Amino acid sequence: PRMASVQNEYSLLCRLYDTDMAEMAVNEDVTLLSFSPLACGLLTGKYQNGAVPDGSRMSINGDLGGRVTDRLWPAVQAYLDVADKHGLDPVHMAMAWQRTRPFAVSAIFGATTSEQLKQILSGKDLILSDEVVKEIDAVHKLYPMPY
């Protein structure tokens, strides 16, 4: 049987898939099951300014599996700034960005609470404007793969 999907970490902050894997997936009609589209919660903004909420992933694993680097925080802030500039919930922006990709993506997200699940699902119909996508692309050029 042929491969139907691959599961890779994929988010605004982690785009290794964009190199050769995306081309293979398009050519072979393979869907990406992207995990951690919110980058372990980093793209929610909840960890900004040194905050570590009780019960959060960072409270259990301080470096989020090696994701916390010196280059991380400016990148996260830049994406949060794009969302803020356009009046978008950063969670909704990060999830909607997955649907802008030129290959098939189905995002696998995690929610610890029902409130988090409601927040994610309430943005399911968001379509990012070309302007927002261009600004996201500009941030990526400034901060490619911060971890």
Residues covered by each model-derived region:
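Beta/alpha (TIM)-barrel catalytic core signal, keyed to glycine-rich beta->alpha loops juxtaposed to Asp/Glu
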Residues: 1-138, 143
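Substrate/cofactor-recognition hotspot
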Residues: 146
